[in-house]
Swiss-Prot record:
It catalyses: Hydrolysis of proteins to small peptides in the presence of ATP and magnesium. alpha-casein is the usual test substrate. In the absence of ATP, only oligopeptides shorter than five residues are hydrolyzed (such as succinyl-Leu-Tyr-|-NHMec, and Leu-Tyr-Leu-|-Tyr-Trp, in which cleavage of the -Tyr-|-Leu- and -Tyr-|-Trp bonds also occurs). One of its GO terms (biological process) is protein quality control for misfolded or incompletely synthesized proteins. Gene3D superfamilies: 2-enoyl-CoA Hydratase, Chain A, domain 1 (3.90.226.10). Its EC number is 3.4.21.92. Fourteen ClpP subunits assemble into 2 heptameric rings which stack back to back to give a disk-like structure with a central cavity, resembling the structure of eukaryotic proteasomes. It comes from the Bacteria. GO terms for molecular function: ATP-dependent peptidase activity; ATPase binding; serine-type endopeptidase activity. GO terms for cellular component: cytoplasm; endopeptidase Clp complex. The keyword DNA damage does not apply. It comes from Clostridium acetobutylicum (strain ATCC 824 / DSM 792 / JCM 1419 / IAM 19013 / LMG 5710 / NBRC 13948 / NRRL B-527 / VKM B-1787 / 2291 / W). The keyword DNA-binding does not apply. Belongs to the peptidase S14 family. Pfam families: CLP_protease. This is ATP-dependent Clp protease proteolytic subunit.
């Protein structure tokens, strides 16, 4: 069971209580602090769309501390980040691994950040399939296509040649915040808001 803190605000009309995530949303902050799956993707996508409808010209801030997760769920978030009119600024706090690092890199150019002790990890897609040989072959082909697509996007967003991305994502590749900046996954290491 997850504990969600509440914030109490004083207004001229009395007190108002918010769960912390709703209060952050008021300031255009979305927090992805767990595995990327269908549920978390639906929540993040809904928040992105809501914030766009509230003010299409004001930046959205997506804070990421995630071990990664589902590719299709992550791609739903990625596509929505690119679709909405406001720039989406990404900030890594703690760890952005796998799909978490992909989403970190998907932030608006010049607005991708990490705190100094953050860790970023990139790798190729994971898959585990069982069944008939023909079905396993279909899934293997699909994961190779996904790998190619993800590597292409990483290459485009980092400015690294596709061959470098392919080599570096062949196995788990861990980077400090400073290394992620040099690599092109983020734009700046920040210490203050």
């Amino acid at each position: 069971m997850s504990l969600v803190p509440y914030v109490i605000e004083q207004t001229s009309r009395g007190e108002r209580s918010y769960d912390i995530y709703s209060r952050l949303l008021k300031d255009r902050v979305i927090f992805l602090g767990e595995e990327v799956n269908d549920t978390t993707a639906s929540l993040v996508v809904a928040q992105l769309l809501f914030l766009e409808s509230e003010d299409p010209d004001k930046d959205i801030y997506l804070y990421i501390n995630s071990p990664g997760g589902s590719i299709t769920s992550g791609m739903a978030i990625y596509d929505t980040m690119q679709y909405v009119k406001p720039d989406v600024s990404t900030i890594c706090i703690g760890m952005a691994a796998s799909m978490g690092s992909f989403l970190l890199t998907a932030g608006a150019p010049g607005k991708r950040f990490a705190l100094p002790n953050s860790e970023i990890m990139i790798h190729q897609p994971l898959g585990g399939f069982k069944g008939q040989a023909t079905d396993i072959g279909i899934h293997a082909q699909r994961i190779l296509e996904i790998k190619k697509k993800l590597n292409s996007i990483y290459s485009e967003r980092t400015g690294k040649p596709i061959e470098v991305i392919e080599k570096d994502t062949d196995r788990d590749h861990f980077l400090s915040a400073e290394e992620a900046k040099e690599y092109g996954l983020i734009d700046e290491v920040i210490t203050k808001h």
